[in-house]
Amino acid sequence: MIYPIPNSETSTVHFKDVYDNYIGGQWMKPHSGEYFSNTSPVNGLVFCRVARSSSQDVELALDAAHNALESWSTTSAVERSNILLRIADRIESNLETLAIVESWDNGKPIRETLAADLPLTIDHFRYFAACIRSQEGAASELDSRTLTYHLPEPIGVVGQIIPWNFPLLMAAWKLAPALAAGCTVVLKPAEQTPVSILFLMEIIGDLIPAGVINVVNGFGSEAGNALATSQRIDKLAFTGSTEIGNHILKCAADNLIPSTIELGGKSPNIYFPDIFSHEDQYLDKCIEGALLAFFNQGEVCTCPSRILVHESIYEKFIAKIIERVALIKQGNPLDTETQIGAQVSKEQYDKILGYIQIGKDEGAELIFGGHPNNQENYLSGGYYIKPTLFFGHNQMHIFQEEIFGPVIAITKFKDEIEALHLANDTVYGLGAGVWTRDINIAHRMAKNIKAGRVWVNCYHAYPAHAAFGGYKKSGIGRETHKLTLSHYQNIKNVLISHEIHPLGLF
């Protein structure tokens, strides 16, 4: 099935010409009156204009968030939970529409937005609705005369900066726990994909008290920086590049603002020789696991962009990979048969092609792809790159630096010790994959890989109840899982003495 182009007569999606900020439950024009053009990576054409916000707009959003905080933070956990459930239901009833919006704004295949992005977005709201209903403070008797208990309380007004690779899902990762905890939010979407969250607010805005969620659009260096440097936020959450994350942390540190940051990765996908002990469905799953590096066009922070394969199976492994890659269907993101869509922007497209050239220049062997995959007709202006495979060594730039595109760098290892060394030989520590039939190898590797998430015999699973976050330069803090609530709460300890006699010290 091929969905009609948005704004066409037969499409269910019609974008407005201009999108404003969403502040205090209302759509507000930017203070400067300026807007920026928003381009679809599907065809390279501008399809709307979006508010280019400044610090004045951020201040208005913070005013609204502060005004709403007292009421929202004292709303019962039951009512907050019910609102999150209603949000999930509303998204679910508009799933197909939002999937089209997300694909057009980002360039990803609609089969992914229909089957992954939107269902996971819905599930995260439902999960945190359940978490806040079941959260309990700890209480204990210290001695026969002293009782203590702990109260989780909303941390306050939260600034959230969202990346462009999963606009709605990454918003849900941050919004759901923050709202559940009783916080109010000022959210800044990525300027590359600003419309998805605005479309969402048109759908769910009536379910949320005014000022609880505020969306301010614009460039990171303007609106994003104003939010990150504000002294009026009580918490900052950011997902994006390590370079920008470093700047964000410095801004927050100047104001002693607690921060959660999820940054880059260069994740290894490790294949042990026993995967070839049988020609079965498991082996087929292993090969598919390697190609998951092309999921979302490789624009995933945990992208398994480094494949480490045992030298004894290298030739057989590569033959199967090439055979499978050649069958990948790339093209129209609105076609449900499409497996790889367009890169998010011209800037990202050029960056990826630049890294492909670096790989060639530094002597890596180009095994497959390595060039644009130009489309025809109305897709001709889009940003499409052929899935690319390189063979090289772990010190090359294409092994050490995050490309964020459909590029896999492959190398060999001789034993488990070398595999572990190669896996950990990176400044990043976000994710890793281990593929083996041997449970002992699986446990040893999972324990010793320095990464926040290790997938064993699977990859790219992101359930709401599994904690996500990085080691090393891949981030600080965790998202998803109930422990995320603690990032949006202060813990108050109450210590009560029922001893009537004084201490006798003074």
Curated annotation (Swiss-Prot):
GO terms for biological process: ethanol catabolic process. Its EC number is 1.2.1.3. Pathway: Alcohol metabolism; ethanol degradation; acetate from ethanol: step 2/2. NAD(+) binds at residues 240-245. The active site is at 262, 301. Belongs to the aldehyde dehydrogenase family. This is Aldehyde dehydrogenase.
